[in-house]
């Protein structure tokens, strides 16, 4: 990277590796950090390391959590009869922003994608089936991205869960191939309200 000393170029390169950060934004972030007091930079670095070492996954739903069980699973006010299945925690957080869903979640950790070498065994599908079979789950709502991988995963999961419970999929006002986490709250609310049974 021309015009920058090696340590600064290295910092810019690290920022560019983050999703959604291009070269110009990476430069702005790096230059901004260099203008901050050393104490603030140390605090930033400590927070980053603490998040990496202290945040794991909930043993029940596999959402990000610093405890063995996440806040959502521990909340007694959540509806126990519904489980909303999402690909990752970003999708869970997007749905939580709508305040339309008061049940529990299950984070798969991705989508079935044979082209990328991701099969059902690499996802949290078997733990979902065990969870649904062991509990009195009235409905499983599949809230997976409308894509080939999302559809494949939805069909696979629905086939495994139908012997145990009702399975539905959220309605989509989203274009095929779009990502759930980028949808606005109104679209996500309507999608939850308009869900339908998986045939």
Curated annotation (Swiss-Prot):
Gene3D superfamilies: 3.40.1360.10, 6.10.250.240, RecR Domain 1 (1.10.8.420). One of its GO terms (molecular function) is DNA binding. It comes from the Bacteria. The keyword Transmembrane does not apply. The keyword GTP-binding does not apply. Residues 81-175 form the Toprim domain. Keywords: DNA damage, DNA recombination, DNA repair, Metal-binding, Zinc, Zinc-finger. GO terms for biological process: DNA recombination; DNA repair. A zinc finger (C4-type) spans 58-73. It holds the Pfam family RecR_HhH. Belongs to the RecR family. May play a role in DNA repair. It seems to be involved in an RecBC-independent recombinational process of DNA repair. It may act with RecF and RecO. HAMAP family: RecR (MF_00017). This is Recombination protein RecR. The lineage of its organism: Bacteria, Bacillati, Cyanobacteriota, Cyanophyceae, Synechococcales. The gene is recR.
């Amino acid at each position: 990277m021309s015009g920058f000393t090696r340590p600064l170029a290295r910092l810019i390169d690290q920022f560019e590796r983050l999703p959604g950060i291009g070269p110009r934004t990476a430069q702005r972030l790096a230059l901004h950090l260099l203008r901050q007091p050393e104490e603030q930079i140390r605090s930033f670095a400590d927070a980053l390391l603490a998040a990496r070492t202290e945040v794991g996954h909930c043993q029940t739903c596999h959402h990000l959590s610093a405890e063995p069980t996440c806040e959502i699973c521990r909340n007694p006010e959540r509806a126990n009869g519904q489980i909303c299945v999402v690909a990752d925690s970003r999708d869970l957080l997007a749905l939580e922003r709508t305040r339309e869903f008061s049940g529990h979640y299950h984070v798969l950790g991705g989508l079935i994608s044979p082209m990328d070498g991701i099969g059902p065994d690499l996802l949290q599908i078997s733990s979902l089936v065990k969870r649904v079979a062991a509990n009195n789950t009235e409905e499983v709502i599949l809230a997976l991205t409308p894509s080939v991988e999302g559809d494949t995963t939805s069909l696979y999961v629905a086939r495994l869960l139908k012997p145990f419970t009702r399975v539905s999929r959220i309605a989509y006002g989203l274009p095929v191939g779009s990502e759930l986490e980028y949808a606005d709250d109104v679209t996500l609310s309507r999608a939850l309200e308009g869900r339908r049974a998986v045939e």
